Amino acid sequence: PRGIILCGETQSAKGVLDAQILSLGIPVLALGHAAHMLIAAMGGACAGVAISEKKAAIQYEKTRLFADVEGGERYLEETLVLMLPADVQVTASAGGCTIAFEDSRRSLYGIQFELERNDPDSSTILKNFARDICGCSPWFTMDAALAQARQKLSDASIEGGYAVCGVS
């Protein structure tokens, strides 16, 4: 893979991130509670709740991940106090609390909120991660996917010469 995106649902589903993922040499973006697991795997720690279930004004640093993302209010469900390792930088904050962080040398990124589908910044952040950080290209369209599937089927040796392909 060219990159990994980790998402976590609830604090009650506490898990431990296998630190070997960090040594694969591919970019990792951890969202929500997965960001807490990432910071722990990087040698940092999480403490008590800093912001809980309220809107907060977020300021973003001009980084590759947050290129073209403007600061503004966002609802934050649960934001913890983070103790960052020495080589990790704060890339977004709200009221003095770390909201996002990165280790740009190892391409490890964490954001303490989930990306919502109706938030225009979410698609920008995902695009920045996929294209600018992971080096992926936006080749996928339904026509391209169908052409690729047809090519794979025609390259395969199908007995009788017919195949049924369902797309959902």
For each feature predicted by the language model, list its residue ranges.
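Short alpha-beta junction capping motif
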Residues: 14-35
